[in-house]
Amino acid sequence: MFTIDFSDHTGLVETSWLDQIDQLLTFAKKKENIHNDAELSVTFVDKDEIQNINKVYRDKDKVTDVISFALEEDEPEIDFNDFDIPRVLGDIIICTDVAKEQSESYGHSFERELGFLALHGFLHLLGYDHMNDNDEKEMFGRQDAILNEFGLTRN
C-alpha cells in the first residue's frame, strides 16, 4: 500500500488535484521500483509559512516553491522487506502562492505545476538532488520522463 497524507493549509487545492497528485506519485513509486509499502505527507502552505519553514529548518530566510524532508537521509540502508512496516519516506511542503506564480510564468495550469512540484519533492525524498550539473541532469531527466509518461505535460 502507498499512503499519502495530504494537508492543505491554504484552501486552494481542489480534491481532484489531490487525486491526480496521488496517482502521479503512485505512478512514480512504481517507476522508481519501490515495491514495498510506503508513506509520505504532502502539505500545501502559503508564502509566509514556507519562508518560516525554510528559515527554521534550512537557515534560508526566503520563499521557495517546494521543500522536502527525507526521513531516510543520512541513515543506513534498511531492507524494509524484512519488516512488516511501511517505509516512511518523509514530508513534501509546497507553496501554492509560488506554484500559482510559476504556472502563470511558464504558461501551464496551476494543477500541472502542483503535480510537477509534488514529483520534484518526491524525487528528493528518494535521494535525487541537483547540487551539481550531473545530478541536476539526472534528476530533471527522470522528472521529465515520469511526467511525460504519466501524461502531465506542459501543454
From Swiss-Prot:
It is an enzyme of class 3 (hydrolase). SUPFAM superfamilies: Metalloproteases ('zincins'), catalytic domain (SSF55486). Binds 1 zinc ion. Its cofactor is Zn(2+). It is found in: Cytoplasm. Belongs to the endoribonuclease YbeY family. This is Endoribonuclease YbeY. It comes from Staphylococcus epidermidis (strain ATCC 35984 / DSM 28319 / BCRC 17069 / CCUG 31568 / BM 3577 / RP62A).
